[in-house]
Amino acid sequence: MTKKLHIKTWGCQMNEYDSSKMADLLDATHGYQLTEVAEEADVLLLNTCSIREKAQEKVFHQLGRWKLLKEKNPDLIIGVGGCVASQEGDHIRQRAHYVDIIFGPQTLHRLPEMINSVRGNRSPVVDISFPEIEKFDRLPEPRAEGPTAFVSIMEGCNKYCTYCVVPYTRGEEVSRPCDDILFEIAQLAAQGVREVNLLGQNVNAWRGENYDGTTGSFADLLRLVAAIDGIDRIRFTTSHPIEFTDDIIDVYRDTPELVSFLHLPVQSGSDRVLNLMGRTHTALEYKAIIRKLREARPDIQISSDFIVGFPGETTEDFEKTMKLIADVNFDMSYSFIFSARPGTPAADMVDDVPEADKKQRLYILQERINQQAMAWSRRMLGTVQRILVEGTSRKNIMELSGRTENNRVVNFEGTPDLVGKFVDVEIVDVYTNSLRGKIVRTEAEMGLRIAESPESVIARTRKENDLGVGIYQP
């Protein structure tokens, strides 16, 4: 009988990536098949996020529902991972004694051993340590699930913004070696992936070891990824302004595979608030980065993160944020009302902004961003956009859907054989959350790189070290 695994994931794209790796790992080691139905599963894993308000209580509410399943099936294994697990540790076991496994983001690769231990002696396992980058050495080969893929290139963050728990839950910055990243991407390209999104909590701070022992920069890595045949689009998230150096901007000048869209969080337009947040940059420095980016890539569109109602934020501070939003002309944003995360310096600050003011500021900010986003969309009307076809449309299964370089969803008529390929589409209509288009050119007419297949890239570049471990050498 097939053993089944159910994973519930909350939070960022890094968590989504981690969950996919858990599924691949437990399939390879134990033969567990993913199921969307928790009641069918032999193992339940909750991959948690501590960014949002009341994250801990949300975890215990979910575990309470799973407790009922365990009462019916005592052999059911329940595991909690992610940032809340890293933060709370044994406290989860104290409140939810039926939880068998507690693991952090850096120890998910040990899940097979943890499950074996629980199966063997029924004693719970807690492992929320930070074993550097070890987890990437223990994961199976990547499996593509469509033409786009996420690839984690580093873990952790050294910035210690006063509101953020990431350095405490994922540890400080650790970069994967360059060869490991390139080989994983080449493997994905061999499976039909055309677009990769490089992931990290502070992705542009990547400083990985090259095959010759030297240290590479993020700009170096971007150019190496762009050189892999079959990879025609590169995205990355999330960046920090303080690490957005001129050499990265130069990549936008000479590397067309790097998309004309950037998510660069700023959080506030007030230097006083930025200082309270520990952001180590000013609003003017942020705008200088955007100015240089638009000189290098005039059509680039920018999204950002904003926190409103941070302790001490005045009406004048908020007005400076709104001015920055207008000056930069952001295309979209992830914006939130401040809520204190336990254990962070901001949690000890006096939360002196009235709740009504926070909600009003968030509404004003989001309305302005939405207006700017719609204006950007309307400018695209009548233009021809290159779309990576990702699958059928959510709105109409008889149509196809894909994304533009600037991350707009476009729905259009087309045949199933176009999935996983690029098409040029004329934008004929604009909606709030999507665009509509019609095909004017298919990939066969584009002259994309076809000299070498991704398979030949792997065959040419795979080497083995003295231990028999495969490495990628450009």
From Swiss-Prot:
SUPFAM superfamilies: Radical SAM enzymes. Binds 2 [4Fe-4S] clusters. One cluster is coordinated with 3 cysteines and an exchangeable S-adenosyl-L-methionine. It is found in: Cytoplasm. Residues 143-375 form the Radical SAM core domain. It is an enzyme of class 2 (transferase). Residues 378-441 form the TRAM domain. InterPro entries: Elp3/MiaA/NifB-like_rSAM (IPR006638), Methylthiotransferase (IPR005839), Methylthiotransferase_CS (IPR020612), Methylthiotransferase_N (IPR013848), Methylthiotransferase_N_sf (IPR038135), MiaB_methiolase (IPR006463), rSAM (IPR007197), rSAM_horseshoe (IPR023404). It catalyses: N(6)-dimethylallyladenosine(37) in tRNA + (sulfur carrier)-SH + AH2 + 2 S-adenosyl-L-methionine = 2-methylsulfanyl-N(6)-dimethylallyladenosine(37) in tRNA + (sulfur carrier)-H + 5'-deoxyadenosine + L-methionine + A + S-adenosyl-L-homocysteine + 2 H(+). [4Fe-4S] cluster 1 binds at C12, C49, C83. GO terms for cellular component: cytosol. GO terms for molecular function: 4 iron, 4 sulfur cluster binding; metal ion binding; N6-isopentenyladenosine methylthiotransferase activity. Residues 3-120 form the MTTase N-terminal domain. Its main location: cytoplasm. Belongs to the methylthiotransferase family. MiaB subfamily. PANTHER family: CDK5 REGULATORY SUBUNIT-ASSOCIATED PROTEIN 1 (PTHR43020), MITOCHONDRIAL TRNA METHYLTHIOTRANSFERASE CDK5RAP1 (PTHR43020:SF2). Monomer. This is tRNA-2-methylthio-N(6)-dimethylallyladenosine synthase. It comes from Klebsiella pneumoniae subsp. pneumoniae (strain ATCC 700721 / MGH 78578). The lineage of its organism: Bacteria, Pseudomonadati, Pseudomonadota, Gammaproteobacteria, Enterobacterales. The gene is miaB.
